[in-house]
Amino acid sequence: MERPLTVLQVSLYHPTQGPVAFAKVPLQLQHDASRLLVGRGQDTHLQLQLPQLSRHHLCLEPYLEKGSNLLAFCLKVLTRQSCVWVNGLPLRYLEQVPLHSVNRISFSGIQMLIRKEGGASLEAFVCYFHLSPSPLIYRPKAQETDE
């Protein structure tokens, strides 16, 4: 009997380069339990068309947490050139952070929202990609006061 796959629902947004930056993004990508590379390189699993991205900018690494039978994921930064923000936390080269069920990620003008839906398979996972016409991450603006 086939086990249901862990699903990553990935929404993508770029304020000016959306259709161009995401031209090579598939609607669906099934991947084995190895790391999923993101960047502009031809050998990445999620290829984004932005010149300021590194060939290997970041990766999603699946792993099994102790005492769990579900895949968990961490995001690891592979670029030396810039910072990647994950849920408000800035990450630099080779830093990594575990992902939660909902994650807000920004890098090089790209906004990415990843929602994780657990599945029983430990051998593979599937990503569904959605292009958003509007921003995914909102930062409150500082309010001016008369004080």
Curated annotation (Swiss-Prot):
Residues 36-108 form the FHA domain. Transmembrane segments: none annotated. One of its GO terms (biological process) is peristalsis. GO terms for molecular function: deubiquitinase activator activity. Interacts with TIFA. Inhibits TIFA-mediated TRAF6 activation possibly by inducing a conformational change in TIFA. This is TRAF-interacting protein with FHA domain-containing protein B. It comes from Rattus norvegicus (Rat).
